[in-house]
Amino acid sequence: MAFLVQELANATAARGHEVHVLTGYPNWPVGKPMTPYSAWRPVSERMGGVTVHRIPFLASPNGPLWRRMLDFKSFELSVRIFGRSLERPDVIHVHVPPNEDALATAALAKYFACPFVLHVQDVQPDGAIKIGSLKSQLAIAILRRQETSVYERAAHVLALGVEMRTRILRKGVAATKVSLLPNWINAQAIAPMDRMNPLRAEWGIPEDRFVALYAGTFGRAHGTAQLIDAAEQLRMDTQVTFLLVGQGHDFEHIQRLTESRGLRNVMVREFVPRARLAELQAIADVSLVTLRSGLGNISVPSKVLGYMAAGRPVIGLLDSSSDTATLLRNAKCGVVLEPGDVVGLAREVRALAANPSLAREWGQRARKHVLDQLDAQVVLGRGVEMLETVARGQAVFQ
């Protein structure tokens, strides 16, 4: 989500505000500082109209749970220490998860006697409990208390969609305190392109192949093994290729599944640099999004906006009541199936492969919806106005 923070910071600075970002050193995906940064030396630099303060922490983006917790806790401690050296802000904005960032922000806001805005991307620890990665009742109780404290101390809370907002309200947060601010996308950076592009050529995907693309995180919450099951339904269909691109906890598992089942209609690739995202999105004839059952009001996969901005239809294996499902229905740009319906997914992919005019129509609708509702130029203005309102000590208009 670093690019969302960057774009919001730039938009805030463009309105004439002085903006400081407190963050770590660039380290994704290997967990080591990129040249010329150091893991232990804090540094400040000017990026456009924003001052970025990079502070030390123990990075571990893809390690076991205990390593990632060390990552989060070390950054929390670093924020508490180095954040106090900054000038007093009028308002602090923080993305969560990880919730440790919110704990550090709450402490910093108390130190400076200023308000902070909690921008929720995933509702945690709900997601971790749901997928089974968090089982200790003691740990859950501690995290619940911390969560309650953060919601109480935040001046305002931003949710990505109606269902996510409802889930937050059920935690006892006042309705006047929670507003909707969907994620956005730069529709100029990700725009429709020719499907026959250099990246497709590098990967050797023939022109006549219909490509079903999954691009994003292979996490426990996503249930990406469903895509392998759907591909197996179409293993004899030489027209369709499932292209799975990304990184995450289940990436190697997906590679092994593909190899063990001998699926020649599946290609698994590591994620491409952000500069090539538009090429990647353009390879698709249809794009895929998955979330495990019960996670629809906890998370809103940002990959969907990239799919839609690229002008591609979307098939989702999602809870029908989820914010993502509602987005696809409102845009009239795809199909929503229940999680686990791999037969239905195979059927819909085959149907779109046989009806390219319908695929193009849905893709055009997707692009139009992004331009009208979710383009950065549309959404960022609202986000900056909310921060300005909170900084003035006023109530955010619902």
Task: Give the positions of each predicted feature.
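Carbohydrate-associated surface elements
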Residues: 25, 163, 184
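Membrane-proximal helix-turn-helix segments that form the acceptor-binding/catalytic region
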Residues: 103, 107-111, 137-159
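N-terminal subdomain of nucleotide-sugar transferases
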Residues: 1-46, 236, 395-398
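Conserved donor-binding/catalytic core segment of Leloir-type glycosyltransferases
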Residues: 206-222, 228-231
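Nucleotide-activated donor-binding/catalytic signature segment of Leloir-type glycosyltransferases, i.e.
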Residues: 238-239, 243-246, 251-278
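Nucleotide-sugar-dependent
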Residues: 222, 273-282, 287-308, 313-326
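A short, well-ordered alpha-helix in the C-terminal region of glycosyltransferases
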Residues: 344, 351, 358-372, 379
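A short helix/loop element that forms part of the nucleotide-sugar donor recognition site in Leloir-type
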Residues: 35-42, 191-205
